[in-house]
């Protein structure tokens, strides 16, 4: 009875972890950036460019917002314009764009971004592999498959933990926002970029928690089956 309860909760937590990982992987809201520029000299109107990016795409669109209004709601699906500009994020990580920075900065950004992308892909593969192993283990009560599935869940949790840490380092240290701001201020007498972590980013740590918990439960289940059968 206790074994069945552990398997049930392990499967539940594992499914939640995989779902959160897949949504974080497929959505383009790891980063929300707002560029506020006063280029026309008007005091009460701000020309704003909104950026959001994920693994696959980086998109941006323009808007005009009155002062004292919150800009974060502009990223909500229903508040976005019907058309916007998008480019492959792994080819142009924000704020680095080809032609706007020297080749050394751009190449370094691409290498860092590529390493982050590889870890993200490995995390997704590990989570899907873990789910497959657990599905195969259930009919046969195989302690080996339960342990392998649990280890894969733990591996996916560790990989996504590294993904989150690397992304924080990217935003806080690697992305040279000061140089980007200085470049844009050549055209606008006042330019202020603002960066926030998006909801896709926050889904990843939640997935890490459920994935690690599922992995530990399945390791315990596998150990229990090995001892008593």
From Swiss-Prot:
Tissue expression as described in the entry: Highly expressed in white adipose tissues (WAT), with 10-fold to 20-fold higher levels than in brown adipose tissue (BAT). Also expressed in skeletal muscle, heart and lung. Lower relative levels of expression in kidney, spleen, testis, brain and liver.
Region of interest (Interaction with ITGB1), ranges: 49-59
Record bears the keyword Membrane: yes
Protein name per UniProt: Transmembrane protein 182
Signal peptide: 1-26
Extracellular topological segments: 27-114, 175-200
Gene ablation phenotype (knockout): Mice exhibit significant increases in body weight, muscle mass, muscle fiber number, muscle fiber diameter and myotube formation and an acceleration of skeletal muscle regeneration.
TM stretches of this protein: 115-135, 154-174, 201-221
Major location category of this protein: membrane
Role according to the record: Negatively regulates myogenesis and skeletal muscle regeneration via its association with ITGB1. Modulates ITGB1 activation by decreasing ITGB1-LAMB1 interaction and inhibiting ITGB1-mediated intracellular signaling during myogenesis.
Subcellular location, record wording: Cell membrane
Glycan attachment positions: 47, 68, 85, 102
Family: Belongs to the TMEM182 family.
Assembly with partners or alone: Interacts with ITGB1.
InterPro entries per the UniProt record, alphabetical: PMP22/EMP/MP20/Claudin, TMEM182
One annotated GO biological process: myotube differentiation involved in skeletal muscle regeneration
Lineage per the UniProt record: Eukaryota, Metazoa, Chordata, Craniata, Vertebrata
Membrane side Cytoplasmic: residue ranges: 136-153, 222-229
Claim: Signal is one of the keywords in the record: yes
Entry keyword set: Cell membrane, Glycoprotein, Membrane, Myogenesis, Signal, Transmembrane, Transmembrane helix
GO cellular component, one term: plasma membrane
